[in-house]
Amino acid sequence: MVKIGVCGPVGSGKTALIEALTRHMSKDYDMAVITNDIYTKEDAEFMCKNSVMPRDRIIGVETGGCPHTAIREDASMNLEAVEEMHGRFPNLELLLIESGGDNLSATFNPELADFTIFVIDVAEGDKIPRKGGPGITRSDLLVINKIDLAPYVGADLKVMERDSKKMRGEKPFIFTNIRAKEGLDDVIAWIKRNALLED
């Protein structure tokens, strides 16, 4: 089972990305989802209502505190959810774990996630990639979402591209508009090639 952690700031499009991935990949792969919220199970409920995934393949973890603590320093609640999900579905191939909304320093405990996708959106401004932080510099894949909003918020995608290359070196990044499925195929291709080790 490959575990992919998806993290990023509130509203960046983490849940939308996970929903889109399950919609396009669950027919070919045995998948499940774990979501994290501080005080609610709102993201899990959204997934249950909008995803093609059956309800028993989605677990919502209510962290009750700092979102990055639940995925890094004390990942015990999430590790229990992973164990529970693996018990339900022993042949699970791909488990997507969504962090609660967090800042640019969010990273997953290596026991919890084999790969990390960090999601930002252009509405935060084109300076976000150059601000760095472990989410930007260390994630296996950086997704820059909501590119359709760039003209409305004064974000320059060329600046974001330049700064992402500078901050990430050889590590990949993908521009997306998840709602319109733009860039989604590239994210799926990255998962298949890097996480699932397909050609």
UniProtKB/Swiss-Prot annotation:
Primary location class: cytoplasm
Membrane-traversing stretches: none
Gene Ontology MF annotations: GTP binding; GTPase activity; nickel cation binding
Organism superkingdom: Bacteria
Keyword flag Transferase: no
Keyword Secreted attached: no
NCBIfam families from the UniProt entry: ureG (TIGR00101)
The protein's name in its UniProt record: Urease accessory protein UreG
Name of the gene: ureG
